[in-house]
């Protein structure tokens, strides 16, 4: 599917999600689900990547996300990571990587999804993470899972793992530094969803 069609599909899904939440859900249920839509930004720079986007759905049981991005190297491996700042009020000057050192923030990075970029340089990710689920937690990436979905600041980070290496592909698709070395892993894009 080409980039223009994916962008249109993402826009339609966004509108349908909003319509379902606004029209088809009784008021009691509407308060128990919250949806936010954010563009992706260049990691470390902050510039918006037009035509990209992420949808985050919060419930008391956990969070779900879909993400569409482009400008990737065709055939390279990418992962999407959940970054939960469970107590964003304890962050210093906005939540970010430095806040992992502050135990009051209760920050954690957890794997979300992995993809190989298409021939057109696009990738679509989707994932769900339940409250308290620490599946795939790696050393140094935090100690707690998602605690309170409606109060956490949630970032979704797209990470590059370089060209696909057949013998390491499983790790490249699911580990923070999978395939690195010999490749170089780096965070490329991020979407920030405020509580």
Predicted regions: what they are:
Residues 11-23:
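Bacterial N-terminal signal peptides
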């Amino acid at each position: 599917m080409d980039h223009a069609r994916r962008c249109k599909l993402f826009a339609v899904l966004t509108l349908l999600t909003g319509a379902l939440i606004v029209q088809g859900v009784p008021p009691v249920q509407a308060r128990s689900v919250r949806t936010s839509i954010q563009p992706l930004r260049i990691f470390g720079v902050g510039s918006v990547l037009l035509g990209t986007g992420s949808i985050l759905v919060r419930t008391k049981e956990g969070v779900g996300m879909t993400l569409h991005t482009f400008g990737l190297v065709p055939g390279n491996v990418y992962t999407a990571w959940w970054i939960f700042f469970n107590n964003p009020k304890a962050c210093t000057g906005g939540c970010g990587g430095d806040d992992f050192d502050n135990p009051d923030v209760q920050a954690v990075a957890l794997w979300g999804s992995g993809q190989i970029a298409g021939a057109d340089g696009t990738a679509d990710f989707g994932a769900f993470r339940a409250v308290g689920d620490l599946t795939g937690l790696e050393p140094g990436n935090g100690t707690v899972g998602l605690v309170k979905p409606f109060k956490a600041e949630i970032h979704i980070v797209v990470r590059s793992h370089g060209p696909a290496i057949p013998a390491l592909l499983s790790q490249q698709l699911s580990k923070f530094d999978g395939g690195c070395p010999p490749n170089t892993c780096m965070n490329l894009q991020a979407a920030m969803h405020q509580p």
